[in-house]
């Protein structure tokens, strides 16, 4: 795959990396003066006319231009007049020159836009009443603002056959205006060259040439950037209008990136999920699982408490009965006879409440499903388990070493950042692990974990590359630590990071060592002192086990005593609920105000978008009620009080949208030398090798029919998925 040459002057494609500050004197000396409707503005050389206009607050209409994509200049809607110039110019593609006076609202500019709009509408169908883009359509808005008030077109309009590009994106290509935003997104951001144009003139069409599924984990973003109704959401088709929905700003929990989202709801139901801008995390993109798995929120839900009767069947009961049974068992067992496992979608408030409850019955056996080595520094030092360079920090790096991970499917937005830096900043990438398609070229160093020791000792050729790097990153996937030699892998990895800091030109504030987590709850659980992995429970099986959203299948009935009493608290009847003796229905992430900490250690909040179904309640409230009935009342009654408790245990958990610097790398490396360094010969194989492994990874996405359709389409082809006959 060839790298795309990029004009460095374009905003969005060449933003200065975070932390890099240009001196004021140098910048000021390079500025040139131009005028926008007579108003003076100082801009850098190479700035386009459109960017200069935006700098003074003048909005120029556009369809093909997008801040994060290369310039195409297809639509011509941004035509403006330059004083004394013979013709109007395309503002998105024309760099300004000193002394230019740009006339955005002159008669010449208006006539040019009206002409362009008339040509765009000549073949555009009058579908607005049935188009899902209605109400948020750029063509609607701009035709009202900049178009003519009458039509001169009397001939027939062209018709284009719709394309089937999978179960997520609905295509009505007669509406397409050939802006090529989707093509540029696929090629530049997603790194998948599936979309392109065929034909020319009136016969030009956008599609996949050979009809096939648009195979990308970021494919849904072409819906957002399409300025018309040519590309819309299949699951959302004909369900709601944008002005009918209530929008709630929230956080995604489908992975550990913590993408910012907007949850659109109507009549107590999630209608769709859209991205929300956050430059340091997801920019303005989200993954397909984040966007489309929401239908899993209304399927296989636990809506009422359940208990197992004398026949061994789970039956519905009241909250009073369920909590009384659990409280009675809590009063019967103490200490090591009580244990808990937290799942991947649990919020920090529920984690601290469960921790306090078990501590009050003299138990500290609190585990997570995900394993993380505790030998050496383990989880005692926060820098040992965070993505310390930060997600946005990838854009500053010059070398990235990926170990035992497939970031394309484990953390799609992190992978998109790597691709962005590879494309624009000549980033060099290397991989230790199974060869996978990462949407960018990389040096495959092998799949043996022993390569880590070779790099650490300096005997591997890539050691020299890391030594010469100014801002290197080494990224270890948490999936590589699930192995029996996870501690040795982490020790070797830590040794590489520390050696780079000592021998290369790394500055003091640059972080080299990074752990890429896969699940949303892991960092908060480690911050609160949970033990990673369930080995402690397997060695000393408890008499009472509390499963808090634990649906990873990390423990079964066979691992526990026959008389072990199991409580499951969660929102889906997935893996954990069927083995439980009592089920307490909890709330999903769209139904509660909760705290999650992403892989870089950034605390963020979800907000209540809809109420929990049936009798389900927020997790921390259930645990608080249980503690009162059990006679070990927890000292908080409100959400604010729970968060005060969070602050007592780990202050960073309530410093929202902030990253606390972690600086104990040298100490962690010294402690790692005490670890058994024996590595296994087994190759490093990430669990999500292909896109088929990406779609269904947790209880919500496994309950989603849309995600099931995606798996079927990938396996059998897009034609295998039957879609309802709709317009």
From Swiss-Prot:
Residues 245-301 form the 4Fe-4S Mo/W bis-MGD-type domain. It holds the Pfam family Fer4_Nqo3. Residues 30-108 form the 2Fe-2S ferredoxin-type domain. One of its GO terms (molecular function) is NADH dehydrogenase (ubiquinone) activity. The keyword Membrane applies. It catalyses: a ubiquinone + NADH + 5 H(+)(in) = a ubiquinol + NAD(+) + 4 H(+)(out). Keywords: 2Fe-2S, 4Fe-4S, Acetylation, Electron transport, Iron, Iron-sulfur, Membrane, Metal-binding, Mitochondrion, Mitochondrion inner membrane, NAD, Oxidoreductase, Respiratory chain, Transit peptide, Translocase, Transport, Ubiquinone. [2Fe-2S] cluster binds at residues 64, 75, 78, 92. Belongs to the complex I 75 kDa subunit family. This is NADH-ubiquinone oxidoreductase 75 kDa subunit, mitochondrial. It comes from Pongo abelii (Sumatran orangutan).
């Amino acid at each position: 795959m060839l790298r795309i040459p990029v004009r460095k002057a374009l905003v969005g494609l060449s933003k200065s990396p975070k932390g890099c500050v240009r001196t004021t004197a140098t910048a000021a000396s390079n500025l040139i003066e131009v005028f926008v409707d007579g108003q003076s503005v100082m801009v850098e050389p190479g700035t386009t006319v459109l960017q200069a206009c935006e700098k003074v607050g003048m909005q120029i209409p556009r369809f093909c231009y997008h801040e994060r994509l290369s310039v195409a200049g297809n639509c011509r809607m941004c035509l403006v007049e330059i004083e004394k110039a013979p013709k109007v110019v395309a503002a998105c593609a024309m760099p300004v020159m000193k002394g230019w006076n740009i006339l955005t609202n002159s008669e010449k500019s208006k006539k040019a836009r009206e002409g362009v709009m008339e040509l765009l509408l000549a073949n555009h169908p009058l579908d607005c009443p049935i188009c899902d883009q209605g109400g948020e359509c750029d063509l609607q808005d701009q035709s009202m603002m900049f178009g003519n008030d009458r039509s001169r077109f009397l001939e027939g309009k062209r018709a284009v056959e719709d394309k089937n590009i999978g179960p997520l994106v609905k295509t009505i290509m007669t509406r397409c205006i050939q802006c090529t935003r989707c093509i540029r997104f696929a090629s530049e951001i997603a790194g998948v060259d599936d979309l392109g144009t065929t034909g020319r003139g009136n016969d030009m069409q956008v599609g996949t040439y050979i009809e096939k599924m648009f195979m990308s984990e970021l494919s849904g973003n072409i819906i957002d950037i399409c300025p018309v109704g040519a590309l819309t959401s299949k699951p959302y088709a004909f369900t709601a209008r944008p002005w009918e929905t209530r929008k709630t700003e929230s956080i995604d929990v489908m992975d550990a990136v913590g993408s910012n989202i907007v949850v659109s709801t109507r009549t107590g139901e999630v209608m769709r999920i859209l991205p929300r801008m956050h430059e340091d995390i997801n920019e303005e993109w989200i993954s397909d699982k984040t966007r489309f798995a929401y239908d899993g929120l209304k399927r296989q839900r636990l809506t009422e408490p359940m208990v197992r009767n004398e026949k061994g069947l789970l039956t519905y009961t009241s909250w009073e009965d369920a909590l009384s049974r659990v409280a009675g068992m809590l009063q019967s067992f103490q200490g090591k006879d009580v244990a808990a496992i937290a799942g991947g979608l649990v919020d920090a408030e529920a984690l601290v409440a469960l921790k306090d409850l078990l501590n009050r019955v003299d138990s500290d056996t609190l585990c997570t499903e995900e394993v993380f080595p505790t030998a050496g520094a383990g989880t005692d030092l926060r820098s040992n388990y965070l993505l310390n360079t930060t997600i946005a920090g990838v854009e500053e790096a010059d070398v990235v070493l990926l170990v035992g991970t497939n970031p394309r499917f484990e953390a799609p937005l992190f992978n998109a950042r790597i691709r962005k830096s590879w494309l624009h900043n000549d980033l060099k990438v290397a991989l230790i692990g199974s060869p996978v398609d990462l949407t960018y070229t990389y040096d495959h160093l092998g799949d043996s974990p022993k390569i880590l020791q070779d790099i650490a000792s300096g005997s591997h050729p890539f050691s020299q590359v890391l030594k010469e790097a100014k801002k290197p990153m080494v990224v270890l996937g948490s999936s590589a630590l699930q192995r029996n030699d996870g501690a040795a892998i982490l020790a070797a990895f830590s040794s590489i990071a520390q050696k780079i800091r000592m021998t290369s030109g790394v500055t003091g504030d640059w972080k080299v060592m990074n752990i890429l987590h896969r699940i949303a709850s892991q960092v908060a659980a480690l911050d609160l002192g949970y033990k990673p992995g369930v080995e402690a429970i397997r060695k000393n099986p408890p008499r009472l086990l509390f499963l808090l959203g634990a649906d990873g299948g990390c423990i079964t009935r066979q691992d526990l005593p026959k008389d072990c009493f199991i409580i499951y608290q969660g929102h889906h009847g997935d893996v954990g609920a069927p083995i439980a003796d009592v089920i307490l229905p909890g709330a999903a992430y769209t139904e509660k105000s909760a705290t999650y900490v992403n892989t870089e250690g950034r605390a963020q909040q979800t907000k209540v978008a809809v109420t929990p179904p049936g009798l389900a309640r927020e997790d921390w409230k259930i645990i608080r009620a249980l503690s009162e009935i059990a006679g070990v009342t927890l000292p908080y009654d409100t959400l604010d009080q729970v968060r005060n408790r969070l602050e007592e245990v780990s202050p960073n958990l309530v410093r929202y949208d902030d990253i606390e610097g972690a600086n104990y790398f040298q100490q962690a490396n010294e402690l790692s030398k005490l670890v058994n360094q024996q590595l296994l010969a087994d190759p490093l194989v990430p669990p999500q090798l292909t896109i088929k492994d990406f779609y269904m990874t947790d209880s919500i996405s496994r309950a989603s029919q849309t995600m099931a359709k995606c798996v079927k389409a990938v396996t059998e082809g897009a034609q295998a998925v039957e879609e309802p006959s709709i317009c």
